[in-house]
C-alpha cells in the first residue's frame, strides 16, 4: 500500500550511444598540394523522437565544410545518436532535456568522431570547440516566443 502511495521518482538515463551515420567527402587530390589554411563552416542540428512512452532517440548532427584557398577541401559529417530514458519528469522540462542536456552528452562523442575521420582523411587534426547547448536552446526558445508575439 505504501508503495502505491509513493510518488514515482523521476528517471533520466543514457541507455545507449552510437554513431548512426558518418562520412568524409574529400573534394579532390589537389587539395593536398596547397598550403593548409582552411576556412571552416560548422553546423549543428539536433532532432529528438520518442521510441516509446519512456525512451527517446536524440540525434546530434555535426557538419563541417572546409575550404582551402577558396576551393572545397572536405565535408565531414556525423550523426551521433543516443537513446535516453526519460520517465516521470514534468512535461515542461522534457524539451530542455532533449534540446540541451542530451546534446551536451552527445557532443564529446561527435567531436571525437569528426576529429578521427578528418585525421584519417590525411588532414591536420580538427578539434571542435565546446558548445553551450543550454544557451543555444534558450535562444531558440526565445526566437519561438518572439515569433509567436509577432504573429
From Swiss-Prot:
Q: What processes does the entry annotate via GO biological process terms? A: protein folding; protein tetramerization; protein transport
Q: Which Pfam families match?
A: SecB (PF02556)
Task: Report the superkingdom from the record.
Answer: Bacteria
A GO-annotated cellular component = cytoplasm
Compartments where located: Cytoplasm
Question: InterPro entries under this entry?
Answer: SecB, SecB-like_sf
Named from the GO MF annotations, one term is: unfolded protein binding
- Keywords per UniProt: Chaperone, Cytoplasm, Protein transport, Translocation, Transport
Q: What does this protein do?
A: One of the proteins required for the normal export of preproteins out of the cell cytoplasm. It is a molecular chaperone that binds to a subset of precursor proteins, maintaining them in a translocation-competent state. It also specifically binds to its receptor SecA.
Assembly mode? Homotetramer, a dimer of dimers. One homotetramer interacts with 1 SecA dimer.
Q: Which family is annotated?
A: Belongs to the SecB family.
Q: What is this protein called?
A: Protein-export protein SecB
Which organism is this protein's natural source? Psychrobacter sp. (strain PRwf-1)
Cite the source lineage.
Bacteria, Pseudomonadati, Pseudomonadota, Gammaproteobacteria, Moraxellales
Q: Which gene encodes it?
A: secB
Amino acid at each position: 500500500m505504501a508503495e502505491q502511495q509513493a510518488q514515482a521518482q523521476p528517471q533520466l538515463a543514457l541507455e545507449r550511444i552510437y554513431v548512426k551515420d558518418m562520412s568524409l567527402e574529400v573534394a579532390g587530390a589537389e587539395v593536398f598540394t596547397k598550403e593548409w589554411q582552411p576556412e571552416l563552416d560548422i553546423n549543428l542540428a539536433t532532432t529528438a523522437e520518442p521510441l516509446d512512452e519512456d525512451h527517446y532517440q536524440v540525434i546530434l548532427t555535426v557538419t563541417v565544410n572546409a575550404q582551402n584557398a577558396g576551393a572545397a577541401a572536405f565535408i565531414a559529417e556525423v550523426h551521433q545518436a543516443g537513446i535516453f530514458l526519460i520517465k516521470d519528469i514534468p512535461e515542461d522540462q522534457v524539451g530542455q532535456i532533449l534540446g540541451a542536456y542530451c546534446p551536451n552528452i552527445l557532443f564529446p562523442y561527435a567531436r571525437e568522431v569528426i576529429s578521427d575521420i578528418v585525421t584519417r582523411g590525411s588532414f591536420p587534426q580538427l578539434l571542435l570547440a565546446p558548445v553551450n547547448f543550454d544557451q543555444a536552446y534558450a535562444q531558440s526558445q526565445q526566437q519561438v516566443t518572439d515569433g509567436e508575439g509577432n504573429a
